Structures are given as structure tokens and as C-alpha cells.
Amino acid sequence: MFDEKDLEQFKKKGTDADKVKAQLELIKNGFPFLELESAASVGNGIVAVDDSQLKVFIKTWDAYCSDGKHSITKFVPASGAASRMFKDLFAFLDADYSVPTTKFEKTFFDGIEKFAFFKDLDAACQSNESKSIKELIADSNYKAVVSNLLGSKGLNYGALPKGLLKFHSYKTSARTPFEEHMAESSMYASGNDGVVNIHFTVSPEHWPLFKKLADSCSKSFSKRFGTTYNITFSEQKPSTDTVAAAADGTPFRNDDGSILFRPGGHGALIENLNELDTDIVFIKNIDNVVPDHLKTDTVTYKKLLAGVLVNIQSKVFDYLHLLDSGKYTAAKLKTISKFVTETLCCRSSDLDKLDSKQLAEWLHGKLNRPIRVCGMVKNVGEPGGGPFLAYNSDGTVSLQILESSQIDLNDERKKEMFTKGTHFNPVDLVCAVRNYKGKHFNLPDYVDKATGFISSKSKNGRELKALELPGLWNGAMSDWNTIFVEVPLSTFNPVKTVNDLLRPQHQPA
């Protein structure tokens, strides 16, 4: 199947023939659907806290930040291109009409002066067309405006990543999501030394642009928020790219005979996450940001999630030290079992069959894992995966964040669980990545390699099958201890299309 050139290509990518064969086998056979016990809901896998508990957890987090013993990092996947944000505007450029016709097009032009990038776009139009946006619209030359927004002769927004686009207007400036993440991180993720660590994963071609922006705004942000920024970057590793298969199941070959590899999706970022030397990691998508006047809820509930995390971690560490000592009673084992099955929602029907030594070993294995606390938002029809109680390969049940592709929607019972789920995943995580002895967990050890999905694509008119790795907060964290906590919808304000920026949540006060 592979010749010497192939093996040389594998070596350069940091992979090998066995891995590639295994990936081709996965593409051929597909992935099994996950067995579900139920959708998670408040009281069944999702914790809802009251105001008094909220205050306690926030105090817990503030104390953790100020004790000077811990490092905190925010991790933001930021490599995605913004092209999908402008899908409707690209379609307008290709349309056989020249004035706004669809609801989307009309909304865009009706609100054009409200976009944070309006001044830049107007300047680009005057430079390239010798006319302002107002004049171009008066001439019904709408497509020139869109071309200057999306194309390389103008702002080039159609080719830039979301993190570098101007999202929000302020009195004397405008901010990108990159800058908004810097601003909000100073409000909940700085230690007692005032340092804010933020790590962005970016694509290689955009790294210099992100670096330039970080260098240009760090000083003013430090002055404004009273913090020092330590901003770092990494790329998705080439070794995490996955092989593409031709229609007959053999490796898809490029015109030059080389084998085609494709990025394996955001699940590959578990490798980048694994390289962070930190105790606690906040994870959030690049486009879920709001202006300063709306950040209160974001900060409050980030602190809540983090407070829950360090509270849980403290108990886990105490239990692990006790189990190591061997000085536990039957009553104490019962207490720890209750914590694992009820608080961590990790259940097994076989526990009654274990003697005390076996039970202690089982509990130790379940407790000594990375921990994540995930915010969950009440379902209001927004897109996103959902929280479930799912069966694992060892027969246990645990909390998982699942996408529709992981669920057999032909099974009416499972389809109902998915469609009638009360909550969805807004990608709002706080993670503890060191064990009770202070050593960093090797995160790839906790990936469920039997998850992922196959998608059909094409290249140069030829069909291919692509392999997506388990998603970062899906299968890549499958074997973590997980707690779901209800957070309000106000903490979830993603920008999926350019017109989302016209929502009140992205407009000035």
C-alpha cells in the first residue's frame, strides 16, 4: 500500500504507516454510535446553584487566585477562518442581481454604519473606489462595498480568522475578539502577581498578524486593566492531520502522487493543551465575547465554574491521599463511592460485587483523572452539542458532551433525547490538568479513540472521505471527570454570521 516516498512523507509529518493504516480502517468501518442512558438535565447530571452558593464559589475562586500558589491559563482555539461568517455576502457577490434582495442582505446594508469595522471599510472604499460607502450605495454599487470588505484589496475579512476582525465599537476605538479575550481574562484569570496567561492556537499564515496585534495592544490593556499579559501561540500539529481516503478506501493521492492529509478538527488541540505548564485552564471559543458593559455575567459565571472546579479538586485530592494511605474505613469508602457516583456522575452497576480493596482501587482509578467543569445553557434552539449520560466501553456511565453525529438518530428513543434535551454546550470549560501529586496528566491518554466522524468531501472534482478526530470537548476529553453547571444564556453570544454583530449583545451601551 505504501512505497518509500510515502514512508518519507509520514516521517516528515510525524506519523507512521501503522497510524495511517489504522485511520484508513476507521474510515472504512466508521465509528460506533454511543449508547445513551439519558440526556442530562438539572438534577440529573446538571447542577443549578442558588445565589448563596454562587457567592461561596466565587469566594473560593478569588481565594485560589490570590494565594500565589497556582498558575492559571486561558486557552482559545483561534485558527478558524471567518469565511463562513460571510457566506451570505459571498453569495451576494456571485448573484445575478446587484441590489440587496434577501433578508440577510437587506439587514446587512440597513445596519452597515453600526458595524465596528465601518470606518475601516469606508476608508477602503474611498481609497479603492474614490467614493464613500454612502456614495456607493447611492449609486446602487453595493457589490463594491462587499468586495472591499471581503477581498484582499480591501479589508480582506473573507480570508482572515475571526479573532482579527473588528467586532465591537468603543468611544475612541474598536476591538477584535482577540482583544476582548484579553480584556475579560484580566477580570477572572489573573493570579496574585497580576499576570494573565492566554494561549491562542492559530494557523501558521496568521501567526504574525496575531503577534503584531498582541504587541500593539498589550501595553494599553495592561495599563487599563492593571495586569501584565503573557500571550503565547501554537499551531495545530501536522502529526495530528488525518489521512484522506479515495472512494475505494485506498489513500487519496494528490496529482504529484503524495498522500493527502487534512487537519483533524479541533480535537487535535488536545496536544496543544497538553503542552501548557499550568494548573487551571479556561477554554472558550474565539467568537463568544461581548463588550465591556456586558461582561459582568461572563465574569461572574466564569468564576462560578472555576470555584466549583477547585472545590471538587480539593475533595478529590483528599480522597486520593486517604486511599493511598490505606487508612480508610468501610464507611469512608461508602462516602467516596457516593461522591464518585453522585457528584461526578460516574456510575457502575458492579460496585456491590467488589470487596473493599477492589472498591478502593476502582475509586482511585476514577478519581485520579483530569477534571473539567462545563457550563451548560438552557436550550433555546441555539446550535451546539448537548450534555448526556452515556455508557463507556467498561460498562460505566459518565457525563459526556455529544454531537449529533455521535448519536443514532434513527433510534427514536435516542433521537428524542437529543431533540428534547433541556440544555446545550456553549463551550465554556474550566479544567484541572494536574494530579494530586502535582504532576501534569498526559491528556492524550484520556481520549476515546473510538469516537470521531467521517465526512464526505471533494478535491479537484474527486470524491474523498475525511476523518475528523474526536472533538476537543467531546471524545478528546471522554475519560475526564466531568461536572455540568447551569449558566445563563447571557454568557453565550457567538458570532456565526456577520449580521450577528448587529445584535444588542454586540453593540455599544
Each language-model region and where it sits:
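Domain-scale recognition of functional cores that engage charged ligands
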Residues: 7-14, 39-380, 389-401, 405-406, ...
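Long, compositionally biased intrinsically disordered regions
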Residues: 2-42, 354, 360-367, 372-374, ...
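Short amphipathic beta-strand starts and helix->beta connectors
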Residues: 182-186, 411-414, 469
